[in-house]
Each structure stands twice: as C-alpha cells, then as structure tokens.
Amino acid sequence: MNAALKTFAPSALALLLILPSSASAKEAETQQKLANVVILATGGTIAGAGASAANSATYQAAKLGVDKLIAGVPELADIANVRGEQVMQIASESISNDDLLKLGKRVAELAESKDVDGIVITHGTDTLEETAFFLNLVEKTDKPIVVVGSMRPGTAMSADGMLNLYNAVAVASDKQSRGKGVLVTMNDEIQSGRDVSKAVNIKTEAFKSAWGPMGMVVEGKSYWFRLPAKRHTVNSEFDIKQISSLPQVDIAYGYGNVTDTAYKALAQNGAKALIHAGTGNGSVSSRVVPALQELRKNGVQIIRSSHVNQGGFVLRNAEQPDDKNDWVVAHDLNPQKARILAMVAMTKTQDSKELQRIFWEY
C-alpha cells in the first residue's frame, strides 16, 4: 500500500468515528436551548376521525391518543422538547366540573416543575372557552398555558388541527407569552381565554373575541397586539389547590313568551346560583321577575347576562333594579363564562356584593 494511503487511512477512520458524536453533541445542545412543553390531551375533534376525507362535519371525536397527535406534527421537534399526557379522552360537551378540577390540578402540578416551560391542552371546541376561562381564574403561574382544538378531524381534507397544534406549541414556547393569562390559539390567532368564544360551529375561523385577538401566529412566530385587562392567573385570588369541589350553577334562557318554569325547576334541583341568559341587556321578562325575586330571597344567587352573539354588555341597574333585587350582573361575560366565574367565586363567598366585585374585576 502507498505510504501516503497508509498514513491517511487511520486519520479518516478517526474522523468518521468523531463525526457522529459531534453531531449528537450538537443535537443535545439544540434540545437544551428549546423550551420544554407538555401537551395534555383531553379528546375532542382535534383527536377525531371520520369515515373519509370528505367528512369534515360528521365524524367521531376523541379517537386518537396524544402520542398520535404529536407524531402527526413532526415539526414540533424543531420548536420545542415536547412530551404528552392523556388526561382524559372525551368530547368536550361531556366535560364535567370534576373533569375541570382534575385538569386544573394537573396543570398546576406541571406548572410548578422546573423542567416545564409551557403547557398546551388539546380540547374539544364545544366547551373549550369554558375550560380556558376556568384555568385563567385558578392557575397561579405566569408560565404559558395554551388551549387548542380544531374544527375538522385530522382525517378530513384541509384539516386545521395540525397547524393549530403547531401554533399552540410555538406560543407556549415563546417567553413573550408569559404573564398573559391562559391563551387560545385557533386559526392563526392568539385569543384571551377569558374573552374568546365559539361564534361559528362549522367554519375553521370559529373562535372570536368581542374585543379582538391578543395576537397572531405566523410560521411559528408570535405577534402581539394587546394585553389582558382583567385579573387572571398569578393575579387571581383563586387557587386550584384550594378548590376541592364546585357549587352547582345553572343557566336559564330568556326568550319571547318565556315562563318561570325552568328557573324554579333548576333551583329545586339544587342550583346555588342561576345565570339568566337574557335578551339584549340581560333583560328579564315581567313573567319571570317575581320568581327570580323570590328565589333570591330563598338564597339563590341571580346573575343577569346577555345571550347576544358578540359583545353582550350588561349594565347594572339598567333594565332591572339590581340593587333593589340584590342581583348580580355578568358585565361582558356570556352566560357560559358567567357560570364558570360564579362557580369559582362561590367557593369563597356567598355575598352578592362580593360576587359583583368579582364580576367587575375578572
């Protein structure tokens, strides 16, 4: 063998042996720089499957586990160190108060961990806004918590779940997301968990906030427009660790020719508070007012809200003499969010004046 080749061969071999370990070291260094994000899966459409790609509205929710969701978006590895947990596997219309508590306590445990930088929760869209607001009230952390879902199952043509999940992890990984309360990422927008609601039930641009989004996500980068104005998370007086159960709060709907039957039945069935989902400015029919006055005298809290689609804003002592009736107004919260705040608030107080303060501040 040529002497030069004899000299080169061992050197080349040594280089080949060194390269893989150098690549591994570089990969490890990259992973150390990435945020650590935990994805908590609860089911919903984002984990759903249809019979064919043409089925975007008819499908079975809560079919895929968290590992398959993560595997379906391999690009997640480029923006975060991701691991998943299956907390539950249900369609979100079936989520109970006990499920809220279970999820909330697991989020709190993870938020305390030094090796967790952000948390993403995959969720069905039907009650996503309720869960997001609940967590916004009770999680004592400034770490990013992002709730995400999809309007189409992953088996559908032009499914939105993969990009929504990618955006959620990107937002949860972003240090700028800290201290902004619980967030919702859908359709490239970053929404406040307090403000956002499902406004459309069939389109991908389904989630809207009456006061506009907090920001947007474009190719994994967050762009922020505003901050939350109400108390939340670290500034909240509520703590999931101190809540073991939630009181029964129900919603009754106001409409033309309404009677007081539903209100009385809900109270007889154990409701500690009733959310009146009223027309317009939380208006109450003259056929219902006497029953609500009587229920309040018997200890049931009466909270007026509005069921208008966007931007309901209930003014105190407008339409009804709330001071005289000892009722509470929900301010700009829709009925379902008013129910969430009432439940959480009533773990601390039964006083209507205190409840009204809480509704102003949260």
Swiss-Prot record:
Q: Where are the transmembrane segments?
A: none
Sites where the protein binds substrate? S92, T125, D126
Domain Asparaginase/glutaminase, residue spans: 35-362
EC assignment: the record states 3.5.1.38
- What this protein is called in its record is Glutaminase-asparaginase
Which reaction is recorded as catalysed by this protein? Answer: L-glutamine + H2O = L-glutamate + NH4(+); L-asparagine + H2O = L-aspartate + NH4(+)
Localization (cell):
Periplasm
Database matches in SUPFAM superfamilies: Glutaminase/Asparaginase (SSF53774)
